[in-house]
Amino acid sequence: MHRISQGFYWALRFFWPLVFYDLLAGAAGKIFGRDCVWLALFGAALAAIPVLYAVWRYRQNRGRRAGIREILTAFAEGMVLGVILNLLMAACGLAEYSGSYEKAAEYMFAMPLALQLLGMCILAPLAEELLFRGLAYTQLRETCPMWAAAVLSALYFGAAHGNIAQGIYGFLVGLCLAKSYEDKGLAGAVAMHMGANTGAVLLQLFFTA
């Protein structure tokens, strides 16, 4: 019975941040409607960030503070990673097999550039790194070696995206983000995630110009 209670507590502690984030996104979607999906997602991220950060600080999670040079390096690495993976996905035609991915991409890249940069390159990386690396990865590291925690948190990150194309992309990026979090702390992981999303936005602009 004690082990069951411990397992339930562990699962509750692990999954509630994602459930909380999804509930915020659902509530924002009801408020703003389907025509403003981007506004709902960004509103959810903005509302989730202070809560997730407070929990991350309360748990006194692992991860050292990165310097400015390390943060800039992580951002540049993220941009390169984002561009390479998006080009590989396009070359493999992976997106064509996922209608939900194409629909999501259509919504996101139809936004004005300023909103794409604000939402996809700032708010979403902050919220997602707090959730998937700051909380989920760190909890896994309490009982798993680094490589296992990286793989499991990357699978969790990929699955949360809800379609095959973004799931594979999220898993591969998630592995790199876990390593960045381990080496450079939360700021390094956030910077790499921001760089990856910025690379994707710039690549989209290049091909649609």
Task: Identify the residue ranges that each predicted region occupies.
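N-terminal, membrane-interfacial amphipathic/helix-forming hydrophobic leader that caps
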Residues: 1-73, 79-83, 91, 198-209
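Juxtamembrane helix-loop-helix connectors linking adjacent transmembrane helices
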Residues: 59-124, 142
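Hydrophobic, aromatic-rich alpha-helical transmembrane segments
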Residues: 3-7, 11, 15, 37, ...
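Non-cytosolic membrane-interface motifs at loop->transmembrane helix junctions
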Residues: 34-41, 100-106, 171-175
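Transmembrane helix-loop-helix hairpins at the membrane interface
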Residues: 83, 113-209
